[in-house]
UniProtKB/Swiss-Prot annotation:
Belongs to the protein N5-glutamine methyltransferase family. PrmC subfamily. The keyword Transferase applies. Methylates the class 1 translation termination release factors RF1/PrfA and RF2/PrfB on the glutamine residue of the universally conserved GGQ motif. Keywords: Methyltransferase, S-adenosyl-L-methionine, Transferase. It comes from Xylella fastidiosa (strain Temecula1 / ATCC 700964). PANTHER family: HEMK METHYLTRANSFERASE, MTRF1L RELEASE FACTOR GLUTAMINE METHYLTRANSFERASE. It catalyses: L-glutaminyl-[peptide chain release factor] + S-adenosyl-L-methionine = N(5)-methyl-L-glutaminyl-[peptide chain release factor] + S-adenosyl-L-homocysteine + H(+). GO terms for molecular function: nucleic acid binding; protein-(glutamine-N5) methyltransferase activity; protein-glutamine N-methyltransferase activity. S-adenosyl-L-methionine binds at G114, T115, G116, S117, G118, D137, W165, N180. This is Release factor glutamine methyltransferase. GO terms for biological process: methylation. Substrate binds at N180, P181, P182, Y183.
């Protein structure tokens, strides 16, 4: 029977080592400490076959997060499935900007539109437990995953509601609306590359220029924000100027774009006047 070290060596001829390690930890249901203190022990046939099947799927391009059913985001371990977008590190910039606009003391109302796995809403709820957080999505399958994540992290005060963008808010107003909407143009060649090939198109593609959902979110914000409330949006690295224009056109003030850790435009914010 092969050892973990031997399996890793063979797998890294086909896939990246970091991916191989993640898949082996999943197949063995162990942590890295166990793996590297027991790297030379023979493994059972079932574990070996399970790992090799995962490697085969990864070699075909299937994302590691979908193969193991989880992805780390913020301080959370988030369940994901093919019904949800895979949370990405750059989206933590969106969470940071939202948190900067939510104080610790008061019960602010927050809406996360297009929540997917619930990663953004749950990260905010974890850091601001006094906030009233509503998370919406037009996918019932995604909301099921999001609700499972809330339960797993004891964040059962987060409310989930099915509906498309502002329709799900039922005319309510919020102190902060946050969203990581689809923002890739339908003709973008990146859609045929990497993990994007396997993620739900509805969570990625937004019209001919990638701005359709962002237009809806910008235009509808004043009717759903309380005076002084913030709209916080993620977008593509080359869309900052266009999104600022959308927010200005909608009548928001204090409009600004923030960069992610790779120094790329990633998040644009605007405030509802009247505060």
């Amino acid at each position: 029977m092969p050892s973990p070290i031997a399996l890793l060596a063979a797998a890294t001829e086909r896939i990246e080592r970091v991916d191989a390690e993640a898949l082996l930890l999943h197949a063995l249901d162990c942590d890295r400490a166990w793996l590297f203190t027991h790297g030379d022990i023979p493994l059972a046939a079932a574990a070996t076959e399970s790992f090799q099947a995962l490697v085969e799927q990864r070699a075909r391009g299937i994302p590691v997060a979908y193969l193991i059913g989880r992805r780390g985001f913020w301080t959370l371990d988030v369940i994901v499935s093919s019904a949800t977008l895979i949370p990405r590190a750059e989206t933590e910039t969106l969470v940071e900007q939202a948190l900067q606009r939510l104080d610790h003391a008061s019960e602010r109302r927050v809406a996360d539109l297009g929540t997917g796995s619930g990663a953004i809403a749950l990260a905010i709820a974890c850091e601001r437990p006094q906030a009233q957080v509503l998370a919406t999505d037009n996918s019932a399958a995604a909301l099921d995953i999001a609700a499972r994540n809330a339960s797993a992290h004891g964040l059962n005060h987060v409310v989930f509601r099915e509906g498309n963008w502002y329709e799900a808010l039922l005319g309510e107003r919020f102190d902060l609306i946050v969203s990581n909407p689809p923002y890739i143009a339908v003709t973008d060649p990146h859609l045929t590359q990497g993990d994007l090939r396997f993620e739900p198109p509805s969570a990625l593609i937004s019209g001919g220029d990638g701005l359709d959902a962002l237009r809806i979110l910008a235009a509808g914000a004043p009717a759903h924000l309380r005076p002084g409330g913030w709209l916080v949006l993620e977008h593509g690295w080359d869309q900052g100027a266009a999104v600022r224009t959308l927010l200005h056109t909608a009548g928001l003030v204090a409009v600004a774009t923030m960069q992610d850790l790779e120094a790329r435009d990633r998040v644009t914010v605007g405030r509802c006047p009247g505060f």
